[in-house]
Structures are given as structure tokens and as C-alpha cells.
């Protein structure tokens, strides 16, 4: 089979075009990422003689986030604008061993949005949300979740719908 010079140049041109398109798409996604999640950990926390879940998200810069509570199944959604994921050692989805959390997953539903979803066994809601300044590893964004029943969950869900952004 003989390939003409013209066909070979056309194939090379298409390859360069696809490579250029790939680079543009990759650069576009990174252009939005002004911040990056560099770590995440979960532990138990005592609040009013009850055990809850403490979620700590470590980032390069102070985190701006919006929180949303959903039911059927219960879950907490954390959207982080202009944030990418730089957590090579953390699986993109996994189980949680601290109640009321049961699992997590993260990704970028849009190039400019980093999203973390915490699946909940029960109708838990954030009772404390705060930021800590860098201490060696980076900025920390902390959310304490506690199951205080379905009514408290619905009240918190409604409040977060009205004012989802946390700075």
C-alpha cells in the first residue's frame, strides 16, 4: 500500500490540529483553577455530648464554597468555584468510617467547579463551618456535621438554599 505525500501531510495536519485542540482544552480547565484541594480528612468530633463528623478540606488558598443539603438519599454537596483537585493519593470515591457519613466522591462537574459530595446515613446538617489559617500544610476549611433529626436537616437545608456561599 502506497501513501502519497499529500495524504501523509493531511494526516500530520490532522494530528497537529487534534493535539492543539487538546492543549487548548487542558489550558482552559486549568485557567479556572485559581485554587486547589490538596488534602481531605474525616474524623469524629464531640458536639453537645454527641458524636458528629468533622470534615477538613486542605487547600492552597483560602476556600470559597457553597453548601447544599439534599435528601433521598441524604447528602452534603460542597461546590468550590475555581478549584481543582491535587490529591493523587486520595481515591475519587470511597467509604467513610465516621457516622453520619457513609461515603464520599469528588470531581469537577464543570471545569471551573470543584465538587465534593458526602453521602450521609442520616439527616445530618452542618452545625459549624469555619476556616483555619495555614499551619504548614495549607489553608483548612472545616465542616462539623451532626444528626439532630429530620426537622433540623430540613431547616438547615432551607437556610443553605437561601444563603449557600461560605467565605
Task: Map each language-model feature to its residues.
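N-terminal secretory signal peptides that target proteins for export/translocation
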Residues: 1-11
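Signal-peptide-cleaved, periplasmic/extracellular N-terminal interaction regions immediately downstream
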Residues: 9, 29-167
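Bacterial N-terminal signal peptides
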Residues: 14-27
Amino acid at each position: 500500500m502506497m501513501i502519497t505525500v499529500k495524504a501523509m501531510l493531511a494526516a500530520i495536519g490532522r494530528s497537529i490540529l487534534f493535539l492543539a485542540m487538546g492543549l487548548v482544552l487542558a489550558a482552559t480547565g486549568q485557567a479556572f483553577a485559581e485554587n486547589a484541594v490538596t488534602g481531605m480528612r474525616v474524623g469524629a468530633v464531640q458536639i453537645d455530648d454527641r458524636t458528629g463528623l468533622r470534615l477538613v478540606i486542605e487547600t492552597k488558598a483560602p476556600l470559597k464554597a457553597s453548601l447544599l443539603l439534599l435528601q433521598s438519599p441524604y447528602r452534603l454537596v460542597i461546590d468550590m468555584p475555581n478549584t481543582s483537585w491535587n490529591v493523587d493519593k486520595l481515591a475519587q470515591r470511597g467509604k467513610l468510617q465516621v457516622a453520619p457519613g457513609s461515603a464520599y466522591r469528588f470531581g469537577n462537574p464543570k471545569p471551573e467547579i470543584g465538587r465534593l459530595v458526602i453521602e450521609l446515613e442520616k439527616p445530618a446538617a452542618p452545625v459549624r463551618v469555619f476556616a483555619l489559617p495555614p499551619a504548614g500544610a495549607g489553608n483548612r476549611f472545616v465542616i462539623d456535621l451532626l444528626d439532630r433529626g429530620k426537622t433540623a436537616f430540613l431547616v438547615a437545608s432551607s437556610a443553605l438554599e437561601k444563603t449557600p456561599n461560605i467565605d
